[in-house]
Amino acid sequence: AFYNSNAGKQLVWIGTSFVLIVCILVIDFRFFESFALFIYLGLLLLLIAVPFLGVTINGSHSWFKFGSVTIQPAEFAKTATALLLGKYLNDPLVNLTKFPFQWKAALIIAIPMLLIIGSNETGSALVFASFMILLYREGLPGAYPALFIGGIILFVSALLVKAWIILLV
């Protein structure tokens, strides 16, 4: 059957993506703004359900299988997080130079990120780090991205350096 071949599956997903793109373009943006919180919470529920109802594919227990179709909620969680973060930052009262607003923005990003890391899907979780650029552009003090980048450098260095060298230092 055509669908069982790799090319067939790709064509089905290209067609599905095209339909989804048209739907997104036709729907008024206020719909997404109005339902951003519900979309986000729904995806959080899916991320919570993955360890219990999901299947393991390529060593990652972060997939749902429906017949021959598999989906990864982490991919949709990125979009849901972007929607809710955009809605939050659109509020004229939000000031990212003040700690309470920084804390709320960090929680919006951190909750799905931690759930995804718990599903052994570190690559998808790292994509959430790119939200730091958005927050910096929207007024987050520069010390936060600097500390974040420093932490990443320290983490990667710790992976590359032998443990006994770290103990000597």
List the predicted regions and their residue ranges.
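Hydrophobic alpha-helical transmembrane segments of multi-pass inner membrane proteins, especially
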Residues: F2-V169
